[in-house]
Amino acid sequence: MNKVIRSHLFTAERAWGALDITNMNGISVRLHWTDKPYKWHINDGEEVFAVMDGAVEMRYKEDGQEKTVLLHTGDIFYAGIGTEHVAHPQGEARILVIEKEDSI
């Protein structure tokens, strides 16, 4: 089934609410809406994080040092296995997240 998703129109009822787009052989593709930070976490798989609308400050740890990068619409952040990170939206943001199904 084909889909067209206008990501800038998606709004969830709560921060980090998601629209499940598809699951491709155990890889989930979800569109998230948020206006609040997530929490520091480490995924048990790789994660691709694409800002579809808005701006997101991504904080992550590399070699024991906390680093920060400001992502704008169209920017992509890749978190490898074991990368501790947290996303802080700057106002409302819509983020496409691609990761292993049930990743934590």
Which functions belong to the PLM regions below?
Residues 28, 48, 55-57, 84, ...:
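Structural motif
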Residues 1-31:
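A short, N-terminal "cap"/entry segment at the start of jelly-roll beta-barrel domains
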Residues 63-81:
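Short acidic-glycine-tyrosine-enriched beta hairpin
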Residues 81-104:
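Ligand-binding loop in jelly-roll beta-barrel domains
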